[in-house]
Amino acid sequence: MSAVDIQATRDAGQQLQVRLAQRLDLGLTLSVLALLGLGLVMVASASIGIADRNLGDPLYFLKRQAAYVVLGLAAASLAYRIRLAYWEASAGLLLGFAYFLLILVLVPGVGVTVNGSTRWLSLGLFNLQVSEVAKLLFTLYLAGYLTRHGRAVREQFAGFLRPMLLLSGAALLLLMEPDFGAAVVLMAIGLALLFLAGAKLWQFALLVGTVAAALAMLAITTPYRMARLTAFLDPWNDPFNSGFQLTQSLIAIGSGSWFGVGLGASVQKLFYLPEAHNDFLFAVLAEELGLVGITVVVLLYGWFLWRSFGIGRAAEQAGQLFGAYLAYGVGVWVSLQAFINMGVNMGLLPTKGLTLPLMSYGGSSMLMTCAAVGLLLRVHRETVESGPLRVGRVTGGRGA
């Protein structure tokens, strides 16, 4: 091969790298793939015992999770290919569909009840958890609302209050299922986006205080939530009843020490820790991979949040406000839910029933989170394709 051919090959490779960099945020993509891969490994490890005992197939949950990951990647690819203008124009319809699902699941005989909670709609092959769909649809709606009414949010109390009333209505429907954790995440997404849009601090503080007081009152006046709160404050007071799950989780995390007991060698997953492959996957990871594994996972979610806000800021500077708010919302949603899940596993927060995004077993969470990642990558693509950043076009919100 001549020197000219070698140089031409190098130039073609560099051009390919530039095109990939323009279309994909490689750092974000790699972190998501790392979480998906590690999640598959940990689901296989955490579920092998219970799958073998209850279903006769030690790889049952791994096979299903692998299928969910494939479907999730397909959902991400589809979301990535659809222009943001379509989602922005459909914001009102998406809001209506979210409310339709939240009401439909509460209709007697329609919603599927598991462990006393009616959160799912049966789709045949798997059950769809409507709260996961609602998180994505409300994030899209809020991004559209703030793009159209950003000035009203900053200057008028009514502009600030309108989306919060809609979110509060959705949160009440979630509490009727009940799904306290999803209601908290949904309200947090709304509050974070309103803050980033430039809502007045006194309005923001008033609403945060009101929401916190309402959630506290709800927790105190509901017996099973009060039991969870009591178990969270002192799980060792009743380690074989209300505090059982948390004490087993703490034992798992403590057993991991610095480097863990080894992949597949967890003891707590062997019928001691309930939901080991689902809500408490992080505890099994901590036991098997130790503090090193915990640090890697925390850094991956931290990087996801960093890149989400980086993509959002770039979009805002380029005048792509819908994409900016969408990126901020997805970043808050995924990272907040991840850190709540880890906090619950470590006994820092009461049990919420939230999955570890992109890692825990479950089809609904995987599909919706992957779709959100696809939208995030679409924001990056459209920002790059819009040309050089135009900083001067941004006015208002705190994200600028």
Swiss-Prot record:
Principal place of residence: membrane
Protein keywords: Cell cycle, Cell division, Cell inner membrane, Cell membrane, Cell shape, Cell wall biogenesis/degradation, Glycosyltransferase, Membrane, Peptidoglycan synthesis, Transferase, Transmembrane, Transmembrane helix
Coiled-coil portions: none
Domain of life: Bacteria
Single GO MF descriptor: lipid-linked peptidoglycan transporter activity
Statement: the UniProt record of this protein carries the keyword Cell cycle: yes
Any GO BP: cell wall organization
Residue ranges of the TM segments: 30-50, 65-84, 92-112, 123-143, 157-177, 179-199, 201-221, 247-267, 280-300, 321-341, 356-376
Stored InterPro entries: Cell_cycle_FtsW-rel_CS, FtsW, FtsW/RodA
One GO CC term on file: plasma membrane
Topology with respect to the bilayer: Multi-pass membrane protein
EC number per UniProt: 2.4.99.28
Location in the cell: Cell inner membrane
Pathway(s) of this molecule: Cell wall biogenesis; peptidoglycan biosynthesis
Keyword presence, Phosphoprotein: no
Catalysed reactions, as listed in the record: [GlcNAc-(1->4)-Mur2Ac(oyl-L-Ala-gamma-D-Glu-L-Lys-D-Ala-D-Ala)](n)-di-trans,octa-cis-undecaprenyl diphosphate + beta-D-GlcNAc-(1->4)-Mur2Ac(oyl-L-Ala-gamma-D-Glu-L-Lys-D-Ala-D-Ala)-di-trans,octa-cis-undecaprenyl diphosphate = [GlcNAc-(1->4)-Mur2Ac(oyl-L-Ala-gamma-D-Glu-L-Lys-D-Ala-D-Ala)](n+1)-di-trans,octa-cis-undecaprenyl diphosphate + di-trans,octa-cis-undecaprenyl diphosphate + H(+)
Purpose: Peptidoglycan polymerase that is essential for cell division.
Recorded family membership: Belongs to the SEDS family. FtsW subfamily.
Protein name, UniProt field: Probable peptidoglycan glycosyltransferase FtsW
